[in-house]
Structures are given as structure tokens and as C-alpha cells.
Amino acid sequence: MFVFDIKRYAINDGPGIRITIFMKGCPLSCVWCHNPEGISSRKQKLYTKKKCIGCRTCVEACPEQALTLTPEGIVTDGARCTLCGICAEVCPALAMEISGTEYSAEALMKEIEKEIVFMDRSEGGVTFCGGEPLLHPGPLLDLLRRCGERGIHRAVDTTLFARPEIVRDVMDNCELFLVDLKQMDSAKHAKYCGVPNELILSNLRMVAEARHDFYLRIPLIEGVNADEENITRSAAFLASLPWEHRIVNLLPYHDIGKSKHEKLGTVYNPVSYTHLTLPTIA
């Protein structure tokens, strides 16, 4: 299992002060994704062109001769590159980085346990995020059970795009889900997120009917889901759920992921989206 980030002292990923573990791999491909390095389950190389000083240190250090310095910056031959990470280690300008570090459950627990004093004093815990953590049910459940044995509050930030039996197993081993509701129309959901939404909505209803705690977030994106029809359908669906706490966060669109797509060399925003103002959201 590869992890692409560990965020300490997180305060927006559940109650209290938390440590958030970002797992690589996601079955969705949302066109506005702000963590595109979390979509692939494998290691990836990120290159920040504006940091590069053209010193050729990485070119000379690469054991596979996969790098070339051009007027456009460093070009990587994907057929040669083994993602060994030497280029990132030697780069004096920090223009190269490898996204994805392989962790065992024991190693991740050591990282989590370092934060216990902050968790205890703030009634915080650990949040498993992604990517999509439910894409790795075996390692995820192992970690959730280990945290449960330590009395650590457990949250899972998930799309809920997973087999119902996986959702049930995870639900039995965590205290909180953090779930996005992106688009009620299944065809539009498939267009903008890469998969239809029937499984997601069915799993969300199952979680609600089990009276399991969850926070709901709706990213509002003009041209995707911020229209009156989708908002009305979203409200009607949520009102139909046997849901006690009813915590809904409306998230305005941002383009933080743009720079990450540039580093990965992937396409960002095939459609131009508009930033919604707070008065518009209200």
C-alpha cells in the first residue's frame, strides 16, 4: 500500500486534532480533483518546472539515463524510468519529487501513535483519506482495528464507491465517515467523475439506515452541480435519509489541483469552471 501524504495537526478532517493518512489509488477521476497524485495506486514522479535550475544533476545521476534537459525543462523517458527516486534525492532545487511511499501497517501505526497526546487532549483521532481508502480494504481494516485497540477515534474519508460488504466491514470498524455528494444525475456523475453514482447513493443510504455517523460535503462547481435542479435533488435525497446529526458542508470550487496536474504532466479542467462567491452559495 502506497501513501502519498501524512498530514499532522489536521483540523478539517473530523473532530479534534487529527493525523490524516492519504492512500494512493481512486476508482473515480473527478475532473476538478485537487489531489490527482492520489488517483493512481502506483508511485509517480512530480516535476516542478519553475523550480528547476537546469543544473543537470538529476540527468547525470539517473542510473537508467531516463532524463534529458531540454529548453522546456527536464523530460522523462517513461519507458526507461523505474521511479527509483534518485533524481528527487539529488535535486538541489527540490524540483523533483516521488509521490508514493510504501508503508506496512506497523510503520503507519508508529506514525499515528506519535500524535496520541494531541488526539487525547483534543478528542481527535486518525482519518484515512485518499485517493480512496476503501480501494485497499485489507490494509485499511487492519489499521482500523489496530487503532480501535488503542482507543483512537477513527474516520474514513471516502467516495463510498465500493462493494457494500466492504462498506459494512469498514463501518463496523470506524466511528465516522466523511462523504462527498458530487452530482445526483448518474450520467453527469459518470461524465465528470468517471463512474455512475447508483452504488454511491445506495451505500450512503445503507450507512444512514445503520445510524452510523457521517459528515456530508457538497463541492459546489458552476457548470457541474451548482444548478438549482441538482441542489434541489440533493436536498430531497438527504431529507429522505434517517440521518440524525445532519452535518452538511458546502465547499466552493478551487483550483488548487492545477499545479499538481502540471507537475504530473496530466490534463486539468477540460472545462472552465467558475469560482462561486459566498453570497452566491448562500
Q: PLM features: what roles do these ranges have?
A:
Residues 262-270:
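Short glycine/proline- and charge-enriched loop/turn segments
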Residues 4-57, 74-83:
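N-terminal pre-triad scaffold of radical SAM enzymes
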Residues 274-280:
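Conserved small/polar residues in nucleotide/adenosyl-binding loops
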Residues 190, 269-273:
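A short acidic, glycine-rich active-site loop
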Residues 31-38, 57-75, 86-102:
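Iron-sulfur cluster-binding cysteine motifs and their immediate structural context
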